[in-house]
Amino acid sequence: MNLSRDEFVHGSPLQARVDLREIRDEDLIVMVQNGQRKAFDELVARYKGRLFSFILRMVKDPTLAEELTQETLIRVYLHADKYREIARFSTWVFTIATNLVRNKMRQRSRRPLLLSLNPAPEDDEMPLDPPDLRQDPTEGIHREELAAIMAAATAKIPEKYRVPFLLREVEQLSYEEIQQVTGLKLGTVRSRINRARNRFRQAIKPMLRNETLLAELERIEARAAEEDNEDKD
Amino acid sequence: MRCTKAMEYISLDLDGQLPPDHAAGLTRHLDECADCRTYREDLQTAGRLLAASEPQLSENFEWRLQLRLNQTLAEAAARELHPWQDRRTDRAAWWRNFAAAASVGMAAVLAVAVMTGPRAPSTAAVGDGPMAAHVATPVVPAGDRLELEAVRGFGYGAGQRSVSSGMGGQRPSQRPGLLGPGWSYQSIEDLRNISRIQAENRQLRTQVFQLQRQLQGMQSQLDTTAVPSLDLPEGQ
């Protein structure tokens, strides 16, 4: 639903009746600019999972990922007045998140937490072990386990390829939006996504042939579709 | 079409970005190349796995977010209400920087003054050079001159005498100029060292005296509390 700017600024009676779930992100942030905390809560509900999913696949640490997700959303609230509708709201949010993640990773690379005398084996090219589904094939793999395996596989992609890859594959941003978020040239975005896909495929290759896993994947997708339908109803 | 090019096109095609003029070429290649067909299927499955594996946030995420946001807003409001708090810290930092800069400046001025100021007459320079016209030539006995050279910068006994000898018996304050001709900061420093060392000597003497008294007390105590010899008489 599109609302005119006057309706936000002057608080028309219509506003009270509007279901926030029907309002576009870009209109919600205008409401936040006018001090409506409820609009911010709605944006949090829409973006917290997407941001966490994106950030976790970047930093691998769930605690740190939650912290950075919170930091991103707080910055959205504090700097809401800086948003201009020259770009989609999602582009703006993921730009903030990407910058925060990059800063954090830069800090971590300057201060390594652990130094080992024995260098870790070069495992970039090693595919991940597929989950052992023989123990309880009827139950299959849990969604959390799958999330952990995918996060580990994603972490094997070099960071410069991973950011555009996740923005495209998980967040479904267009190439132009990824270009805006990352500041890369369009051709570079294309080639990095292609290379990241290749690396990701190498990392999960054994899983791609696992019939039990593929069956569970179909069940997960069916459940997600049902939940979407319930939300719409 | 090579497979590497086809893989690039497959990626673009999955995102709906493949130009139509390349689509036909890719289709032809996929009809002929089983590896590239598998590659395309793998990418599709990988994308589905990634989408299905959305990680879950902890249950109290929103509550913690609200808490953190409220704290941030409260801190921001406090800064607006009491901006002097920030200014006070700024002012303290400014004073610290100023004090440091002033110390460096003072040290530099003193160093220049020491380097360029009048110096104590040395035995070789007395009566010679540009100072000779302004400085009354001190009468230094030959023996004292030698001592002056020998002790400058070392001890205080002979040095003290050499300073007084170098001044020809006059007090420094009676001399014209900032320090008076014939005086240098080195001479003043020597005098300070002398008085400091004398004070230290007095303290040391006092300590030695006290320790001697303590030692005497302990010896007398030892004499009075001395146990008899433990040597038992023979036969016991």
Annotate the PLM regions.
Chain A
Residues 53, 67-74, 87-99:
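Structural recognition of an alpha-helix C-terminal capping motif at a helix-to-coil junction
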Residues 13-19, 23, 123-152, 224-228:
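Acidic, proline/glycine-rich intrinsically disordered inter-domain spacer in sigma factors
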Residues 46-49, 57-60, 166-173:
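Short helix-capping/turn signature of helix-turn-helix
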Residues 151-188:
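Helix-turn-helix DNA-binding module
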Residues 2-11, 112-119, 149-152, 166, ...:
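C-terminal edge and immediately downstream basic/flexible tail or linker adjoining helix-turn-helix-like DNA-binding
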Residues 17-18, 33-42, 52-71, 186:
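Short, charged helix-capping/linker segments at alpha-helix termini
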Residues 78-85, 95-116, 195, 204-206:
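Arg/Lys-rich amphipathic alpha helix in sigma70-family domain 2
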Residues 27-31, 149-158, 203:
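Short amphipathic alpha-helical boundary/capping segments
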